[in-house]
Amino acid sequence: MIGIDIVSISRISKIYTKFGDKFLDKILSGNEQNSVLNLNYNLKLERLAGIYAAKEAFAKALGVGISADFGFLDVEILKNDRGAPFLEIAPCIIKKFNIKNADVSITHDGGFAISAVILEMSKF
């Protein structure tokens, strides 16, 4: 299954300005919050938009959206040693949706963050 999402960085800026840490607590795990903690403001907004888009793309790949079946904190978008994003999925989500493999890509351009997620799920 494939999920794709695009989000305006200015939209994330408005939400973050209005709600601050409450917004971060709603969409980011502790590890994700630590990953953006010391970034300058513009880079932080870009990273937040990328994470948000990746989580929305993940939900779309599951076919459920953000819902009772899947929430923002059920997957973490982290970076490996080379700076490439990867998914850390809650074990209950892996089991519930029979996820065997997951890949994510995030890009930023022209004031937008775009993400694609590919999930390989078994039928049983």
Curated annotation (Swiss-Prot):
Q: Where does it primarily localize?
A: cytoplasm
InterPro entries membership: 4-PPantetheinyl_Trfase_dom, 4-PPantetheinyl_Trfase_dom_sf, ACPS, Ppantetheine-prot_Trfase_dom
The EC number of this protein is: 2.7.8.7
GO biological process terms, alphabetically, are: fatty acid biosynthetic process
Q: Which reaction does it catalyse?
A: apo-[ACP] + CoA = holo-[ACP] + adenosine 3',5'-bisphosphate + H(+)
- Reply yes or no: does the keyword Repeat apply: no
Does the keyword Ribonucleoprotein feature in the UniProt annotation?
A: no
UniProt family annotation: Belongs to the P-Pant transferase superfamily. AcpS family.
Q: Which residues bind Mg(2+)?
A: D5, E56
**What is the protein named?**
Holo-[acyl-carrier-protein] synthase
CC terms in the record's Gene Ontology section? cytoplasm
Recorded hits in NCBIfam families, A to Z, give: acpS, pantethn_trn
Q: Which cofactor does it need?
A: Mg(2+)
Q: What GO molecular function annotations does the UniProt record carry, in alphabetical order?
A: holo-[acyl-carrier-protein] synthase activity; magnesium ion binding
Could you tell me the gene encoding this protein?
acpS
Q: Which function does this protein serve?
A: Transfers the 4'-phosphopantetheine moiety from coenzyme A to a Ser of acyl-carrier-protein.
Where in or outside the cell it occurs: the entry states:
Cytoplasm
Keyword terms:
Cytoplasm, Fatty acid biosynthesis, Fatty acid metabolism, Lipid biosynthesis, Lipid metabolism, Magnesium, Metal-binding, Transferase
Please, which domain of life does this record's source organism belong to?
Answer: Bacteria
